[in-house]
């Protein structure tokens, strides 16, 4: 299907659905969900993986079997310094310069700290990382992150794990308009219609985890998300009709019989 893949950091990614691995009941279910989602990119927190020689490697083996690209993240970091250190550890452990940059500002909301995030992004870009920052839906911060060289911006639709969907569609549209890098909606997706809406707003991809891993049937939900992302992208490219206050008949009056 045209438009399914997209370019990220100079690499063609085979699907516009990015899948997180947190919250899965077990590795068997996670593997089934990854395959059902058709994703080409999965995120992994460094602290969830034993990457030392002789370590369990269960999650890494699973990712390798599925043939998808691994994107380490800096989950659990609250300062720029912590995030930079974790990014370096991930680069050494996984042999990748890619990092999903997370710098959390508050334990209750899990929303990003924009000041620390921008500081960490600038430092990591200067050190040769391909930086994909989890950010708020603030268009100005998104533009600043793009300006310092981030390969994409990843605004939250709503707080992580909340399932509230896209709380501020207008800001997501503004972000799409003010940056030239890919926009990946990250966090807050609850069901397939949320993912479709994100794509209809112009996002290049959607990243989600809890919506699949904590669903009653993770594999079925992964399948639903796959098609929702594809449908949303097609709808965005097709162009929706303008919203109108009054009705507009689809059938013309020409040829109507005189009764």
Swiss-Prot record:
The keyword S-adenosyl-L-methionine does not apply. It is found in: Cytoplasm. CDD domains: ThiG. It is an enzyme of class 2 (transferase). InterPro entries: Aldolase_TIM (IPR013785), Thiazole_synthase_ThiG (IPR033983), ThiG (IPR008867). One of its GO terms (cellular component) is cytoplasm. GO terms for biological process: thiamine diphosphate biosynthetic process. 1-deoxy-D-xylulose 5-phosphate binds at residues 161, 187-188, 209-210. Pfam families: ThiG. Signal peptide: none annotated. Its EC number is 2.8.1.10. The active site is at residue 100. Homotetramer. Forms heterodimers with either ThiH or ThiS. Belongs to the ThiG family. This is Thiazole synthase. It comes from Salinispora arenicola (strain CNS-205). The gene is thiG.
């Amino acid at each position: 299907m045209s438009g399914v893949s997209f370019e990220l950091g100079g690499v063609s990614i085979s699907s516009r659905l990015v899948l997180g691995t947190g919250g899965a009941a077990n590795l068997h279910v996670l593997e089934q969900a990854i395959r059902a989602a058709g994703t080409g990119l999965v995120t992994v927190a460094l602290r969830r993986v034993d990457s030392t020689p002789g370590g369990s490697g269960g999650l890494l083996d699973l990712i390798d079997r599925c043939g998808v690209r691994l994107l380490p993240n800096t989950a659990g970091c609250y300062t720029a310094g912590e995030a930079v250190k974790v990014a370096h550890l991930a680069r050494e452990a996984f042999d990748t310069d890619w990092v999903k940059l997370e710098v959390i500002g508050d334990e209750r909301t899990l929303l990003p700290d924009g000041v620390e995030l921008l500081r960490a992004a600038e430092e990591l870009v200067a050190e040769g990382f391909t930086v994909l920052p989890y950010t708020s839906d603030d268009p100005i911060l998104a533009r600043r992150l793009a300006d310092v060289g981030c390969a994409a911006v990843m605004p939250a639709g709503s707080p992580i794990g909340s399932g509230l969907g896209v709380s501020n569609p207008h800001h997501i549209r503004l972000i799409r308009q003010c940056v030239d890098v890919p926009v990946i909606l990250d966090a807050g997706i609850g069901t397939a219609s949320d993912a479709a809406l994100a794509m209809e707003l112009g996002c290049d991809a959607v990243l989600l985890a809890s919506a699949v891993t904590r669903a009653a049937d993770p594999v079925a939900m992964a399948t639903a998300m796959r098609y929702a992302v594809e449908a949303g992208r097609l709808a965005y490219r097709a162009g929706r009709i303008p919203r109108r206050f009054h009705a507009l008949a689809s059938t013309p009056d020409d040829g109507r019989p005189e009764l």
